[in-house]
């Protein structure tokens, strides 16, 4: 039975239709020709498939070109994309001043050489299905509506536009308030010698809300990047840097719980490598497990290796369509790692090889044997076991600004080794090792909890807490009441203060007695007069942000989330906590204790989230 699935006002409608006369019939239709889509189309055409590319914008490359994100952030090397990158560098030296423009031109050349048909300024407005197998598309173009038939469709729209129309299930945003990562706008600049790019992070935006997106675009284009910069601004890039959108529910996902439990897929298509790169500083409102890692153990900037399953790009219960882009099937925590340019280039190759095997063998995507795909990916270097490097410390520079070699993290397995690490300013690995070791670590940690050494005892308190023991609660309360301002030094960015970490763990443990102190932190106007907020050398952000009280924000955001967690566990405390939220946030005056920046700025957006999240939970109670 043939269906046409369409979306109207955010709702899906599927109706039975006759098989249409397709205006264009191809082996592969690629929707969205950005970082992943342009390469998926090119690699597939090189493999011998007939390919149609459909793009809403007016050039190829997406974020990698029109978005101004020219370079790589970590990732793994190897694969067919490296030849393209090498050509781009040569093209740039000969013809353009930047790699973004060179990549646009080179990709256009490759498309023409490989006879890839391209529809620019085109939008998908319907999906044809034979039961749950995608067989074609309805596309709105400048020339009118075209009916496209394809043996396989790839949704590379970044926001799962096509699969959403088809009726596939997807997720979006963080659990606390549905918001996504902050967006950026990239600027082309000139420092008197070289051309380059810089970016400004803004607030969060729901790109599926046309009014909100328009407001975000206008605001971003009104801001000039001035803080800490000495260069001439030449241009703004045409598209916003949206870091997050929908994520499909796939046949096999990659998740943070699996990663931390050392459970890896048996069928990877490549290995992703980066930190859980959450932009913004309100990580208090992310998942508890991410909080354990990034706040409770202070390891947020450690790099992780994610084995990405090949079926993470196959929507659950659907056939004939792949999603090789940012919308692939990973959980939200992992998505902040598996989204970098190298990842998108590798997933493009994996999808092109998978589609090629299916078309040439005359089978469905599910019928393609993984070993055949694996052989292709290993041959090109896209998939290498040497890329499976676990957890590492990377991106560290010395005083001369030289990049130091990355080092592998070796977790502690002998409890007697805890003290040596806990007494340092870098106890994070010991704290997480305790979680991995389990109750076997507890006797040693309880002994260290009574150490006369301040670092040892306080860091042991975090390690005891990660094992869900309440034995360290009195010391955690003491750290909060002191507003312990010691900043750990495990990471190259986003290190935490002990006072904030103590608040986090008291919330995770559901401590009733700390509630009055936390309410005082969020309600007392004189809180900002404490010494911890006056120290100029304390900085929890990646860079100094003028007119933003970042340390105060960390204490308040952790307190809000801790109160929510305690309220979820203790119904009798909910009225007291709810009153605290009302006293803290009902008046707009609270906003100006943090910043005077616009509500659409990154900082303003985070401050507004304090109120929104607090009231959302209180209203549910």
Question: Regions from the language model: what does each represent?
Answer:
Residues 2-9, 15-25, 43, 49-50, ...:
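Conserved N-terminal/central alpha/beta ligand/cofactor-binding core
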Residues 3-14, 19, 63, 140-141, ...:
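Flavin (FAD/FMN)-binding glycine-rich loop and adjacent Rossmann-like elements that form
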Residues 32-35:
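Glycine-rich Rossmann-fold phosphate-binding loop(s) that bind the pyrophosphate
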Residues 131-137:
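Short, hydrophobic/aromatic-rich segments at coil-to-beta transitions
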Residues 405-407, 424-439, 443, 447-450, ...:
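Structural detector for internal amphipathic alpha-helices that build alpha-solenoid repeat scaffolds
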Residues 408-422, 444-446, 475-480, 517-522, ...:
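Buried hydrophobic core positions in alpha-solenoid tandem helical repeats
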Residues 476-487, 519-534, 579-594:
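Amphipathic alpha-helical segments within extended alpha-helical solenoids and repeat-rich scaffolds
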């Amino acid at each position: 039975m043939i269906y046409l699935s369409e979306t109207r006002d955010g709702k899906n409608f599927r109706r039975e239709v006759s098989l249409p006369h397709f205006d264009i019939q191809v082996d592969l239709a690629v929707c969205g020709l950005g970082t992943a889509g342009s390469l998926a189309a090119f690699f597939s055409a090189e493999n011998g498939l007939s390919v149609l590319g459909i793009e809403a914008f007016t050039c190829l490359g997406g974020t990698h070109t029109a978005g101004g994100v020219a370079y790589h952030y970590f990732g793994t090397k190897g694969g067919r994309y490296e030849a393209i990158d090498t050509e781009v560098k040569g093209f740039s030296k000969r013809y353009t001043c930047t790699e973004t423009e060179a990549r646009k031109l080179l990709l256009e050349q490759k498309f023409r050489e490989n006879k890839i048909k391209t529809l620019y300024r085109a939008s998908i407005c319907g999906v044809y299905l034979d039961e749950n197998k995608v067989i074609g598309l309805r596309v709105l173009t400048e020339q009118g509506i075209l009916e496209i038939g394809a043996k396989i469709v790839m949704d590379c729209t970044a926001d799962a536009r096509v699969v959403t129309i088809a009726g596939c299930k997807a997720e979006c945003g963080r659990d606390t308030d549905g918001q996504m990562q902050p967006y950026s706008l990239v600027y082309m600049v000139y420092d008197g010698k070289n051309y380059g790019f810089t970016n400004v992070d803004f607030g969060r935006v729901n790109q599926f809300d046309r009014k909100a997106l328009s407001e975000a675009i206008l605001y971003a284009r009104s801001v000039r990047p001035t803080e800490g910069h000495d260069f001439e601004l030449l241009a703004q890039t045409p598209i916003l840097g949206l870091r997050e959108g929908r994520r499909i529910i796939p046949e096999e996902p990659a998740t943070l719980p699996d990663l931390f439990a050392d459970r890896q897929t048996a069928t990877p298509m490549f290995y992703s490598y980066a930190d859980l790169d959450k932009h913004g500083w309100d990580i208090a409102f992310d998942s508890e497990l991410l909080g354990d890692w990034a706040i409770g153990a202070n390891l947020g900037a450690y790099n992780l290796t994610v084995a990405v399953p090949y079926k993470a790009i196959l929507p659950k219960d659907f056939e004939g369509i792949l999603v090789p882009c940012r919308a692939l099937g990973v959980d939200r925590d992992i998505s902040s790692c598996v989204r970098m340019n190298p990842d998108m280039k590798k997933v493009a190759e994996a999808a092109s090889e998978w589609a090629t095997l299916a078309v040439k063998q005359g089978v469905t995507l599910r019928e393609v044997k993984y070993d055949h795909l694996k052989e292709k990916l290993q041959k090109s270097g896209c998939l290498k076991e040497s890329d499976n490097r676990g957890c590492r410390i990377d991106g560290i520079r010395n005083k001369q600004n030289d990049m130091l070699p990355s080092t592998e993290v070796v977790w502690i397995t002998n409890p007697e080794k805890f003290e040596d690490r806990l007494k340092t300013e870098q106890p994070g690995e010991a704290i997480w090792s305790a979680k991995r070791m389990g109750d076997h670590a507890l006797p040693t940690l309880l002994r260290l909890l009574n150490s006369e050494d301040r670092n040892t005892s306080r860091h042991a308190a975090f390690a005891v807490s990660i094992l869900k023991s309440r034995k360290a609660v009195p010391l955690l309360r003491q750290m909060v009441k002191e507003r312990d301002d010691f900043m750990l030094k495990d990471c190259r960015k986003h290190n935490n203060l002990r006072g904030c970490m103590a608040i986090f763990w008291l919330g995770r443990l559901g401590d009733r007695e700390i509630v009055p102190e936390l309410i005082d932190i969020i309600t007392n106007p004189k809180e900002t007069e404490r010494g911890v907020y006056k120290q100029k050398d304390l900085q929890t952000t990646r860079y100094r942000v003028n007119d933003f009280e970042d340390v105060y924000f960390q204490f308040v955001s952790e307190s809000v989330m801790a109160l929510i967690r305690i309220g979820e566990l203790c119904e009798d405390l909910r009225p007291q906590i709810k009153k605290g939220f009302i006293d803290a946030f009902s008046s707009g005056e609270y906003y100006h204790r943090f910043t005077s920046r616009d509500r659409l700025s990154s900082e303003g957006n985070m401050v507004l989230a304090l109120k929104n999240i607090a009231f959302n939970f209180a209203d549910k109670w």
